[in-house]
């Protein structure tokens, strides 16, 4: 809906790559030019100076996914603040915080404070990740009132059913579940990072519920896991895989398969 509201054919949008594919895909549908800025290959972090250079008078949107999908990397609020300050106020910066609940490295990871500092910032959240409601399709956006009112004029009626609303309210009220989920994810994520370090596998430091890593034979490893019933995401970069952090018992099995494969 954001794309339909803001993009006119001939506009450009700026995205870091690799990134969630829907940013570019939805922009193309609306006739936008997609300007892709490669992330730092060694760390997976955004190249903010290159993002700023990619923005010009045609740019209507800059997408920031934080933590980023598929790299899992987290960008500091201060770095995002500097980005917003460096681009024209006519360009909207959308910060997708779908995975923000999984961040454990900082006490307050959200960029919410930037809404009070800049008129061209919007933040998206979802109940699909840490709250476990992917099939209910519940999300929301924090944005300046003027933009919210403008988007309301094209919003489809009945876009959120009653069952989804009730489920979201119940999930939001169960913060103990969210805390438990985040804690277990961090614990299991650390086990994978430790094994990758041991095996000399290049990976990006993740603050999400997945890890993006390079494998000597990515397709072979993915096939080995698949034979045991475990599917990982392929195709987002040649030679790399995105592994969603599994439950503890499944993680033990998958790590054994990885060890055997590497040996």
Residue map of PLM features:
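Short glycine-rich anion-binding loops that position phosphate/pyrophosphate groups of nucleotides
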Residues: 20, 66-70, 100, 129, ...
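Active-site pre-lysine segment of PLP-dependent enzymes
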Residues: 28, 45-58, 70-93, 97-128
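Phosphate-binding glycine-rich loop
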Residues: 1-12, 30
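Short beta->alpha connector loops at strand-helix junctions that form conserved
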Residues: 17, 36-41, 236
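PLP-dependent enzyme catalytic core of the Aspartate aminotransferase-like
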Residues: 78, 219, 224-228, 233-263
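PLP-dependent aminotransferase class I/II
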Residues: 120-197, 201-204
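Conserved PLP-binding catalytic core of the aspartate aminotransferase-like
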Residues: 186, 195-228, 245
């Amino acid at each position: 809906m954001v794309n339909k509201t803001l993009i006119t054919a001939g506009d450009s949008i700026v995205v870091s790559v690799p990134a969630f594919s829907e940013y570019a895909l939805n922009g193309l549908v609306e006739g936008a030019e997609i300007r892709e800025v490669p992330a730092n290959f060694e760390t997976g972090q955004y190249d903010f100076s290159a993002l700023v250079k990619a923005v010009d008078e045609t740019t209507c949107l800059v997408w920031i996914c934080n933590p980023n999908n598929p790299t899992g990397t987290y960008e500091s609020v201060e770095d995002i603040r500097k980005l917003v300050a460096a681009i024209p106020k006519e360009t909207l910066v959308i910060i997708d915080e779908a995975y923000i609940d999984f961040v454990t490295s900082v006490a307050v990871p959200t960029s919410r404070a930037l809404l009070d500092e800049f008129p061209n910032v919007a933040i998206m959240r979802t109940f699909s990740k840490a709250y476990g409601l992917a099939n209910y399709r519940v999300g929301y956006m924090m944005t300046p009132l003027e933009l919210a009112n403008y988007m309301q004029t094209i919003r489809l009626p009945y876009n959120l059913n009653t069952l989804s609303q009730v489920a979201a309210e119940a999930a939001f009220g169960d913060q103990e579940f969210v805390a438990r989920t985040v804690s277990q994810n961090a614990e299991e994520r650390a086990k994978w990072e430790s094994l990758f370090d041991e095996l000399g596998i290049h990976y990006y430091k993740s603050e999400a519920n997945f890890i993006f890593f390079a494998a000597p034979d990515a397709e072979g490893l993915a096939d080995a896991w698949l034979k045991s019933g475990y599917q990982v995401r392929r195709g987002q970069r040649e030679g790399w895989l995105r592994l969603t952090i599994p439950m503890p018992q499944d993680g033990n099995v998958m790590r054994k398969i990885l060890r055997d494969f590497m040996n």
